[in-house]
Amino acid sequence: MIFKNGPKRLGPILLAQRGGSPLKGYWSLPGGLLETGETLEEGIAREVLEETGLRVEVVEFYGIFQRVMRDAKGRAEYHYLLVDYVCKVLGGTLQAGDDVARVEWVPRRRLKEYQMTEGTLSVIEEAYDRALRKRT
């Protein structure tokens, strides 16, 4: 998760619109697959750069989430294990790249306007709530 004003402030969050299957057109947090030999932190930084044009520093572990997508017959078609971290932008120019159609900074009040991949909205809302609790 990448917040525009850094992980300690509650500004807009960066979303990427998927450019290919599965779930083409849906919005999600930037990310992707690890390459052989990469650490989680290296893979996150590489994927964010490829998808958004931004260089990031991985700041803290957020959580692990599982997502199973089933076909019409109920069989598992995709099974994802998502490891989320909070990141801070170091530089770069925001632009859609790699396998995304668009990237946008989205304010919390507008999140429900975006068609997101399953579970993404609840993860983001919890991140905002967690950040608010840390501030008090």
Q: Can you annotate each of these PLM segments?
A:
Residues 1-13, 86:
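Conserved N-terminal beta-strand and adjoining loop/helix that marks the start
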Residues 32, 46, 59, 106-109, ...:
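Structural detector for helix-capping/boundary residues
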